[in-house]
Amino acid sequence: MMGSFLSYAFRCDDKIAFTAAENPVEPSSCLLFFDFFFLGKSSSSSSSSSSSSASLCSLSIILDDSSLELFCSSSSASSPSIIVSFSGSLLNSWLPLFLFSRPNSAFFLVLFLSLVSTLCLEPMINYVLIFLRLLYRFIHSICLLPFLISYGHRILDFFLSKFSNKRVMEIHQNESQTKSKQTLFTI
């Protein structure tokens, strides 16, 4: 299972499906899938004995349009165990998730998602989406500023040329009228 997590990172379009907690994730609905890898200690304790061994854990996030699920699969486990699962109308539009490069960041991500799960998650995601949309519109308007400025200059030049032509015609008319008056006066 570890190899499949490694090979199918960033490849949601392949014919794959992961099943955990009786919830299959279809590849057609997968929007984003990536892995966090870190080397941790997996310990199991019971009333009689306790043991700890090093294992490579793959922390994976699978997103679709209605759920967000966080998996962790180790080399000793036969199937990935689900850590955090959110379902509902979480994603109204594109929600960017940033890939953390530090090894311990996956642990902090689990803590963060666990903390968020105890709070009201959907309003917070809605606020984040509103902020991202406003940021996108702001960046989009900044990118459009040179075009708006160039077209604005053209529009201003057009109106100024019209106004200046009209003004020049008025001046010529005034000059012709004064010349005609002067000729009449001299006659």
Curated annotation (Swiss-Prot):
Q: Main localisation, per the record?
A: membrane
Keyword set, alphabetical order: Membrane, Transmembrane, Transmembrane helix
Keyword Transmembrane helix among record annotations: yes
Disulphide bridges: none
What's the protein's topology in the membrane?
Answer: Multi-pass membrane protein
Q: State the compartments where it is located.
A: Membrane
TM region positions? 80-100, 105-125, 129-149
Please provide, in alphabetical order, the Gene Ontology terms of the cellular component aspect for this entry. Answer: membrane
Going by the entry's taxonomy, the superkingdom of the source organism is recorded as Eukaryota
Q: What does the miscellaneous comment read?
A: Partially overlaps RRP15.
The protein's name is Putative uncharacterized protein YPR142C
